């Protein structure tokens, strides 16, 4: 038997779609006689209301918009999987919008599309342009959750990792072994997460009463593998370090390959670690040691947090900090 829809109920009951939705939502504005008629048809058709049917009366579209830079896709695709699965479980539609690149996308145009499609809420990814994005969603009073950075704002939720703790613990471990020549590699120097990673590194050096020179120990690189690889082929002709820590797996792979092509043995001559733990870390030779972030879970948590905000559910906090795991493979000595 064909599954009944809200259109079938409205037609059989002789009422509008909005009236059916109001009955489903228990609205008091519907006359008792009309309510009884609609409920009778719902029972006869065995109609099971979904979020869209409920949303017609509440002016909700049950749609969540995701906005992220195209160049981050390799790092966030698993996160999008978590967002999609959580959205389906909670009967929300997910619409994806991409900006051209980190910090360079037409954010005003994207936000105009989000507003035009009447998305109930927005999930943003931490990027160089995040401050502008947050201001835009606040300006238009769109509920939002940011993934990848802590946001202390009553109107914005966030799902993040403690980036300072990650680098502090890693760097502190190497400094305790007497391995002081450590550099940090990232394509996003202005990113709040990157700033936090650098701060954690600085603190470890300070606690060991060792000098930290940001001008030489923090290296800005490209988001494109080929450019990063070329940059480090040149760098390793004159430099070798105890540890290179990269903010993303892709940059970590570029470092490993450039080092090997300069006859630097990984991990005997130099160790390499990166963050995220995507498939890049497994196809690298030697395999790349990483900080595993629960990417899929972060996406699912962001959806759950956003839906609670949308439904005005009571929340202990809008700032959700998730854990991480150190995964040691062949690019480090452990």
List the model feature ranges, each with a label:
Residues 1, 5, 59-172, 176:
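Alpha-helical recognition/docking segments in bacterial nutrient-uptake
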Residues 1-61, 333:
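N-terminal helix-turn-helix DNA-binding module of bacterial transcription factors
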Residues 17-19, 56-72, 181-188:
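Short beta-strand segments enriched in small/hydrophobic residues
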Residues 65-67, 118-126, 183-186, 237-251, ...:
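Periplasmic-binding protein-like
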Residues 68-78, 97-105, 159-169, 185-231, ...:
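Hinge/beta->alpha junction and helix N-cap segments in small-molecule ligand-binding domains
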Residues 180-181, 212-216, 266-271:
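Short acidic capping loops at alpha-helix termini that bridge into adjacent secondary structure
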Residues 233-334:
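Flexible loop/turn connectors
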């Amino acid at each position: 038997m064909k599954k009944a829809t809200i259109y079938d109920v409205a037609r059989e009951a002789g009422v509008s779609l909005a009236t059916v939705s109001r009955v489903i939502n228990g609205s008091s504005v519907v006359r008792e006689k009309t309510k009884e008629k609609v409920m009778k048809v719902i029972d006869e058709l065995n109609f099971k209301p979904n979020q869209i049917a409920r949303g017609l009366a509440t002016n909700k579209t049950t749609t969540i918009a995701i906005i992220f830079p195209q160049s981050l896709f390799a790092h966030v695709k698993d996160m999008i999987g978590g967002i999609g699965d959580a959205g389906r479980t909670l009967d929300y539609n997910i619409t994806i919008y991409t900006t051209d690149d980190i910090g360079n996308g037409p954010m005003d145009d994207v936000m105009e599309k989000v507003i035009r499609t009447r998305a109930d809420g927005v999930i943003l990814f931490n990027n160089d342009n995040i401050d502008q994005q947050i201001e835009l969603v606040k300006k238009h009073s769109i509920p939002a959750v940011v993934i990848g950075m802590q946001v202390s704002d009553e109107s914005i939720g966030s799902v993040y990792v403690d980036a300072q703790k990650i680098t502090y613990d890693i760097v502190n471990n190497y400094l305790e072994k007497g391995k002081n020549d450590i550099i940090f590699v990232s394509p996003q120097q202005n990113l709040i997460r990157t700033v936090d990673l650098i701060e954690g590194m600085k603190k470890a050096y300070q606690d060991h009463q060792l000098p930290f020179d940001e001008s030489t120990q923090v290296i800005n690189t490209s988001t494109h593998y080929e450019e990063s690889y070329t940059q480090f082929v040149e760098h390793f002709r004159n430099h070798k370090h105890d540890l290179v820590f990269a903010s993303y797996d892709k940059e970590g792979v570029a470092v490993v390959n450039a080092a090997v092509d300069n006859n630097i043995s990984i991990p005997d001559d130099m160790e390499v670690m990166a963050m995220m733990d995507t498939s890049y870390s497994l196809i690298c030779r030697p395999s790349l040691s990483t900080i595993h972030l629960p990417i899929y879970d972060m996406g699912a948590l962001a959806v759950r947090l956003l839906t609670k905000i949308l439904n005005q559910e009571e929340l202990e906090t809008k700032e959700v900090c998730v854990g991480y795991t150190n995964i040691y493979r062949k690019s480090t000595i452990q």
